Amino acid sequence: MTNNMNNYPLLSLINSPEDLRLLNKDQLPQLCQELRAYLLESVSQTSGHLASGLGTVELTVALHYVYKTPFDQLIWDVGHQAYPHKILTGRREQMSTIRQKDGIHPFPWREESEFDVLSVGHSSTSISAGLGIAVAAERENAGRKTVCVIGDGAITAGMAFEALNHAGALHTDMLVILNDNEMSISENVGALNNHLARIFSGSLYSTLRDGSKKILDKVPPIKNFMKKTEEHMKGVMFSPESTLFEELGFNYIGPVDGHNIDELVATLTNMRNLKGPQFLHIKTKKGKGYAPAEKDPIGFHGVPKFDPISGELPKNNSKPTYSKIFGDWLCEMAEKDAKIIGITPAMREGSGMVEFSQRFPKQYFDVAIAEQHAVTFATGLAIGGYKPVVAIYSTFLQRAYDQLIHDVAIQNLPVLFAIDRAGIVGADGATHQGAFDISFMRCIPNMIIMTPSDENECRQMLYTGYQCGKPAAVRYPRGNAVGVKLTPLEMLPIGKSRLIRKGQKIAILNFGTLLPSALELSEKLNATVVDMRFVKPIDIEMINVLAQTHDYLVTLEENAIQGGAGSAVAEVLNSSGKSTALLQLGLPDYFIPQATQQEALADLGLDTKGIEEKILNFIAKQGNL
């Protein structure tokens, strides 16, 4: 993909923020227009996150114009909105490779650029890291500024408020910018608010404010009265949230129009030299400047390649995704059981819960980006006699590990975890691979862990977890299902596998959706294939039988080898005193980079060809076939 830079005369001059800072202020609106158009053209040809970046064009330009990046340190939360940042910081010509194998990362990444201060992918980490960076700069007398940009979704997480509370107590110099692209926080944006923001962020007001504090410290009653008066003024003239952030120890400014580049530059210029923790609230529109994305910001959050002129996203008419299989199952159960409750931490669309939320709104809870709360909220519902189902990505369940142990498993409560995006996820890369859930759940007492090999198995396992009366997890991958026939729901025998093919010498123990590769290989190698179904409790009887009747056992999974399903098989063999040769195939001991799912599996030797080579090499090393 190549963009015709003749269409972008100003942007073509910008190879770093230093080039940007050479522009006159009156050139910035044109630059924003070109940057937005370039972003749209690039993403439409490569796929990626679009709507968030369209909404942060003016903010990105203003930040790099006012602050001396990379000396001043700019930290983006999550990173979906950082595409304009990448374009302005020397990676414009590499945008055609974003989210692709060996290409630039979809999120800010420290190894990629000195302008990427913090590697991100998960939400709500920016303020905590930013505070640490600001404290380090303060102790070194570096004179550098620290700016954190966080969205109105990410700031709902408890971690963000923990960091705000700590920052206010430390009174460290830093700026937190709330990028509010929803109507849920405030709507009072306009010329008056922009003007007031200039006043309250100005040096005169700041000097008077700080001077008054020093004097009034000696007269506590008057000091408290003046503090309340200032908070009331800001609460009336700005938004009700100003009082909240002021109470946390921040000087609140806003909300400011996040698409008015002149006002942003003026306000940020004022705020750059303010002391102590500062909080700037800006209002933006997700998808700004591209009508289809403004109309459907969720649909255009992450997009495949599409035609930007028509604005139509390609429709997937192939096999249903595992997410849809889950969503359909949940609706089917809710039709029969008013006590089943669906819970998601801000992943309604991704987890396949849109239809459920619309048809059964009283049985649906989106708890926002609050994974810890989601799990313990489910705990309470289970105690109350309900049947909670927590739909969560594998990579995000990591954030609620203590709750999984302390609140669910220790109490042996019937909470079902529908774990989406287990295994290789593809283009989002290292921060989003579902590589660890089997390993971190397998060691927890009372847990039942299931690994479906196709969509029908997935439905049956969800039903089994729903019925079993214990903590249960069903892990399934991103993407389309196999296309098998769906059968009526029935509870599976807990901890029992199923023999798929009987062969000789080699037995492949499959955990999950790599079963088609195992079956294809079994014909070449005359191997036995067992779909293990359960990681915990594991089918000890089957493992011992296979060990007695075969020379080689091969375990197959999309999870880290360390502590994974293969390790469970090794433990059974060891405790049974079996010396059968065991080959464990799974994800290696490093963070797996971005690529398509097929490319990643091939690189890891977990496609059919790679699995065959590993098995044959293993047997050769054993000395005989």
Curated annotation (Swiss-Prot):
GO molecular function, one term: thiamine pyrophosphate binding
Residues involved in Mg(2+) binding: 152, 181
Biological pathway: Metabolic intermediate biosynthesis; 1-deoxy-D-xylulose 5-phosphate biosynthesis; 1-deoxy-D-xylulose 5-phosphate from D-glyceraldehyde 3-phosphate and pyruvate: step 1/1
Class of this enzyme: transferase
Catalytic activity of the protein: D-glyceraldehyde 3-phosphate + pyruvate + H(+) = 1-deoxy-D-xylulose 5-phosphate + CO2
UniProt entry tagged with the keyword DNA repair: no
Keywords: Isoprene biosynthesis, Magnesium, Metal-binding, Thiamine biosynthesis, Thiamine pyrophosphate, Transferase
Xref: Gene3D superfamilies: 3.40.50.920, 3.40.50.970
Record carries keyword Metal-binding: yes
GO CC annotation terms, alphabetical: cytosol
SUPFAM superfamilies: Thiamin diphosphate-binding fold (THDP-binding), TK C-terminal domain-like
Pfam families in the cross-refs: DXP_synthase_N (PF13292), Transket_pyr (PF02779), Transketolase_C (PF02780)
EC number: 2.2.1.7
Record-linked CDD domains: TPP_DXS, TPP_PYR_DXS_TK_like
Cofactor: Mg(2+); thiamine diphosphate
Function field: Catalyzes the acyloin condensation reaction between C atoms 2 and 3 of pyruvate and glyceraldehyde 3-phosphate to yield 1-deoxy-D-xylulose-5-phosphate (DXP).
Family that this chain belongs to: Belongs to the transketolase family. DXPS subfamily.
Subunit structure of this chain's protein: Homodimer.
Protein name: 1-deoxy-D-xylulose-5-phosphate synthase
Protein species of origin: Haemophilus influenzae (strain ATCC 51907 / DSM 11121 / KW20 / Rd)
Lineage summary: Bacteria, Pseudomonadati, Pseudomonadota, Gammaproteobacteria, Pasteurellales
Gene: dxs
